[in-house]
Amino acid sequence: MIDSIFNFSKSSEFHQFCELSAAIGRNPLLVQGAGGNTSVKEDGLLWVKASGTWLSEATEKKTMVAVDLAKLQRAMAQNDERVEKPQYFKADPAESLRPSIETVVHATLKHRVVLHVHCVETISWAVLENAEKLLAAPLEGLDWVFIPYRRPGLPLAREIQSKITDKTNVLILGNHGLVIAADSVKEAHQLLLEVHQRLRRTRREVTIPKSNFALTAESNYRDAEF
């Protein structure tokens, strides 16, 4: 298992995954601060963003941690309470990084590459009361589902599990964000761009209110209490 960790972490595919993760992390329309998480599955391992790390630094410092995928999935099937603490399923117990609390969400999806972002465009729809109905038109033709808000971690993973099919690769998370799933880094990137573009809002013109500075120049209107 340790050899697998070393070999894949040195592969070109892993570097492509880290490059995409970093690019996503540098885009404030997709990720804010230390938010968002990404993963890639390889040789029985689930490489996922570590808790407390920044996606934007994925090519600069150690950001991903390997999880024993089969062990985690077995625990999920058995309702093992440890799945709420994915550090129990690290492939290398000596690794100091802790897997993201949303590791179980990544393990639930069968696709090789999973991107979870807090896309501003997506959230502008996902916060609406009738979001699922409104999203039907812009997302027509995609294999997508709407997931009502659930607490990150196992509750969210269970809700996803109850809604998806093997073909589902776009998940709109109510009041939360967006999940993209694909079988390659390139496909995941392309699908993310497509969904982001489809959900773009028309920018509104902002009118700057006029003020009669002559009337307010000698007043204390800024200090007034309301």
Model-found features: residue ranges?
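Glycine-rich flexible loops
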Residues: M1-F226
